[in-house]
Structure formats: C-alpha cells, structure tokens
A protein has these predicted regions:
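Hydrophobic anchor at the beta1->P-loop junction of P-loop NTPases
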Residues: 99-101, 111
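Conserved P-loop
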Residues: 109-183
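Interdomain "pre-motor" coupling segment immediately N-terminal to P-loop NTPase/helicase cores
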Residues: 1-66
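Conserved catalytic network of the ASCE P-loop NTPase/AAA+ motor domain
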Residues: 91, 120-123, 198-201
C-alpha cells in the first residue's frame, strides 16, 4: 500500500469493494489474477484484478467462501487457494477455469459444488457435463458393454465419491430427503466420452473435464 496506495481510488458496488491503484507492480498484473496482502496486526486483503490498463489496475475484494455462511453446497474453502478457486468457478464472467494441484486438494469437489450451485440454485446453466480421458492405470479391461454413459462409469469413481460427499452435507434432510436430492442431482449430470465430442456444440452447459492433464 505504501507504493501503490498514494493515488488510490476506492468504491463499493454489489457488496464488494473496488480499488483503482497505480504503482510499479501494476504493469505485471493481468485480469483474473489474484492479489493478497497478509500483514501482521492488520486484516488480510484478498482481491482479484478485474481491469488492467498498464498504468492502473482495478482490484475487487473477494467473497469469503471460508465462512460457513457462504458455503457452496455445504463446501467451504479450507485455505486461501481454495477461496480463490471458488471465486473463479462461481464468476459468470469467467468462462474457462483450470485448477492444478496435488491429489486430494478438493479440485473436483469444489468444481462440482460450484456447478451444482449454478445449475440447481441460480439456474445459470441447464445441466452439467462431465468427461475425462479414458486412460487406464494398469492393464486395459477391454471392451465394455452398455451405452456411452455406462462405458464411462469405471472412470467416474471420483465423481461418485464427491457426489456422495455433497449429498451428505445436507444433514437436516433425512435419509429420504438425501435420496431425493441425490436423484435430482444425478438427473442434471450427463457423463460424456471425449471420444465422441468432436463437432459437438454445448449450449448453456457447465462442462467439467476431470484429470485434464
């Protein structure tokens, strides 16, 4: 702030605070990049770059998904990076998000929670399409019977595991309520094979590519 706050402008919009800053780091900032300041004795600042002209940049504070009141389908961010990820996944102006990290860091869980929130609650998209490359870890199990979705099931264990976590997050729904919710959720999720995607056009869909590497 000592270097970038001298000519700073700030304003509030939609419950979030915006800062227009100028300084030596501004030329290195790009849109949708996150900036944070964690100083001893002061409240931390977490923000996303929404505009960058080279001389000035606009930062917007984030919605804090680390708080239970802002949980997404029962999922709360456990750390700074997960909070950044949820802010991107739930931003309707951000069309393409890639998440990278070690195993068991919540990438698929957060993405699925964000997708369900925007399909079931906000009605922003009509359904969720999930796909991944069908590369076996060990020996190939050969030809699989069934339709496209049934053939994909052996590779969708992580999806099923995360759906189970999300359906159990509604503790007050009871067993019948959770079963009904689970059936409704699954009706909004379509599993597609990448082998048959060439030439397809998906309109108003939330597309998840798991294990994209």
């Amino acid at each position: 702030w000592d270097q970038h706050g001298k000519t700073m402008e700030s304003w509030n919009q939609g419950g979030l605070t915006y800062y227009r800053i100028a300084g030596p780091l501004v030329p290195t900032l790009f849109v949708n990049q996150f900036a944070y300041l964690e100083a001893a004795g002061a409240a931390p600042l977490y923000a996303k770059v929404t505009e960058s002209t080279g001389k000035t940049a606009v930062l917007r504070t984030l919605k804090e998904y680390t708080h239970a009141k802002n949980s997404v389908w029962g999922v709360t961010a456990r750390n700074r990076e997960q909070n950044f990820a949820l802010n991107l996944l739930l931003d309707p102006e951000c069309d393409f998000v890639t998440l990278t990290g070690t195993a068991a860091t919540g990438k698929t869980l957060m993405t699925l929670a964000a997708a369900l929130s925007q399909v079931m609650d906000d009605r922003r998209y009509t359904e969720i399409i999930v796909t991944r490359v069908t590369v076996p870890v060990g020996e190939d199990i050969g030809y699989l019977p069934g339709n496209e979705e049934e053939k994909m099931n052996p590779w969708m264990g992580a999806l099923d595991d995360n759906l189970e976590v999300l359906s159990r997050s509604d503790g007050g729904a009871g067993e019948w309520g959770r079963a009904a919710t689970n059936d409704l959720v699954r009706s909004k999720i379509k599993i597609k094979s990448m082998a048959f995607m060439r030439g397809r056009t998906f309109l108003n869909k939330f597309l998840i590519i798991d294990e994209a590497q």
